[in-house]
Amino acid sequence: MKSGLLTCLVFACVVASAQSTPVGGVASEWDVRKLLESLDLQAQHVKPIIDQVKPQTWVAKGAPQAYVTQWTTAQAELKYLLASSESLSKEPERLTLALDTYFRMQALELTLASVTEGIRKYQNPALADLMQAVVSENGSNADKLRQYVQDLATQKEQEFQIADREAQRCRETLMKQPAAPIKGVRK
C-alpha cells in the first residue's frame, strides 16, 4: 500500500513538472505576450479606419443593409478580440483562451474583408486599400498565433497522455496489492 502511495506521489510530481516546463517548441510566456502586444497594436490601427466608415450613407447609394450589420459586427469583434487577447496575455498557458483569441481574430478578418469591399465600392477606394493593408500587416501575427495554438494543443495533449498513463499505472499497482487485513475489534 505504501509503495502505491509513493508511486502516486511521484506521479503528481511528474505531472506538476510537465505542466511548468514548456515542451518542444511551445513559445515562452514572454514571447506570447510580445505577440499579443503586437496583435493588439495592429488591432488598434484598425479602429480609426472602422470609425471613418459610414455604411448608413452607403444604403442611400444602393448598398445592401447587410453592410451596416457587418460594420457593427466588426466594431464588436474588435472589442472582443482585444478583451480575449488581454485575457490570454494574463494566462498564456490556457488553450481555451488561445483558441478564443485566434478564432476572434479570424472572425474579425473575415468581417473586415466584406466591409472593405463595401468601402471600396460605396465610400473610398483609398480607405479600402488602407484597411486591407492594415489587416494584411497582421498576417504574420496571425500565423504566429496559429502556430502557438497548435503547439499549445500538442503540449496539452502530451501532458494528458502522460497523466493518463501514470494514472493507469497507479491503478494497476494498487489493484495488485493485497487488501490490508481487517483488524478485529478488541473487547
Spans of features found by a protein language model:
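Bacterial N-terminal signal peptides that target proteins for export
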Residues: 1-8
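Compositionally biased regions
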Residues: 4, 18-21
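Hydrophobic h-region of N-terminal signal peptides that target proteins for export
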Residues: 9-19
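C-terminal amphipathic alpha-helix
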Residues: 24-57, 119-187
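Alpha-helical segments in soluble extracytoplasmic regions
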Residues: 42-106, 111
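Surface-exposed, polar helix/loop patches in the mature regions of secreted/periplasmic/lumenal proteins
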Residues: 86-143
